[in-house]
Amino acid sequence: TASMVVAPTEEETAASGLVRNEDFYNGTAATEDADSGSPLEKMDFTTGLADAKNITFDIDYGAVTVVVDGGAAEPTLSCTNLRQDWFTFTNTGDNTSPVRVSYKVPANYNLGKELGPEPEFVLSVPDANTFHFKRLSITVAMGDAEFDNSDTIAADSIDLDLAMGCFTGSTVQAEQFTANISMGDFDLGLLAGVETAKVEAAMGDIGLTVDGRPDDYALDLQTSMGNVMFNGRTMSSTYTQTAAAPRSVTLTAPMGDVVLTTTQ
């Protein structure tokens, strides 16, 4: 028998900024977790995130997407296909600690079984003219991360850590950018304003474009079993250069290709 999840009281809902769609799945069997029969939930956090410039995702299973909503006044978070007992949302509201979005699969849970629809965590933020992350940190054990943006996502620093998944993005402005991908590809259309970028894809390819001229950067591009390409030229498996400006890009893909392009 499927266990029932008790809905929050009106007071709890108001306090947390949580909007519950009780009839999202209409209780059909196809939306239950195949292993436990637990119902899957949809949760929307629509208030209380105006000053949430420091956000951390710690996800065992699911896809994380950051989108730009040019008409939005503040960030919102929409989560679907959730096991509620695995999900935690923490927001102190005082800007002293990051907003934390956590989805932790129990250690003894058999991930080899069919888990049903993949959980999705979608963070919508206003455009870069009105919203700027101090720090955005995304850790996913099994699932992709995507910046699905036509406008720029801006941050002081961005940290990505994906064990089994790919990262794709359009345009990002960040001073510090770090990505570690154990098994998957990295593809970012434009990284602007970066001072230090470090990307490692242990078993995948790296594709990155940065703003500026080639000699604006100190470079360390390395692969063991693939090719290094810099502005369309195929280099050896290792390419390094120094620069007078304190901007650096380090890209490492031992088993894949490294492709770096500058806009000028």
Predicted regions located by residue number:
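Charged, low-complexity, helix/coiled-coil-prone segments
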Residues: 62-68, 77, 159-168, 194-198, ...
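Generic short beta-strand segments
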Residues: 102-108
